Curated annotation (Swiss-Prot):
Family: Belongs to the RuBisCO small chain family.
Assembly and interaction partners: Heterohexadecamer of 8 large and 8 small subunits.
GO BP terms in the entry: reductive pentose-phosphate cycle
InterPro entries with a match to the protein in the record: RuBisCO_ssu, RuBisCO_ssu_dom, RuBisCO_ssu_sf
Organism from which the protein derives: Cupriavidus necator (strain ATCC 17699 / DSM 428 / KCTC 22496 / NCIMB 10442 / H16 / Stanier 337)
Gene (UniProt): cbbS
Coiled coil ranges: none
Name of the protein this chain belongs to: Ribulose bisphosphate carboxylase small subunit, plasmid
Amino acid sequence: MRITQGTFSFLPDLTDAQITSQLEYCLNQGWAVGIEYTDDPHPRNTYWEMFGLPMFDLRDAAGILLEINNARSTFPNHYIRVTAFDSTHTVESVVMSFIVNRPADEPGFRLVRQEEPGRTIRYSIESYAVQARPEGSRY
């Protein structure tokens, strides 16, 4: 199951040239770029681990791509995403994110149904990747 989170998630994986184009766009907008990774892609897991520090002062897309490749070699079986942060007053938020690396096997999610009092059914989803495997060894 292919995880669809962030910008471009329904498109085929981006090439390095396409990633560089997106990085240049982010830098031209004045956004700070960061790299994050995780092995738990649950949709509500919005707090991924930072790979290094956010690149507030970096203005070269090639340098950011070098850091992306370092993250790929360090965490080849994790999801890696690029985030672009807009520090403009009244925005001050991530305005763009896209996945630049994913594991070869994406196990997907299972739907959990739980009966509650009054014939109420509560639904939740769990990642197959986190079942019976600790963080860091899920892929």
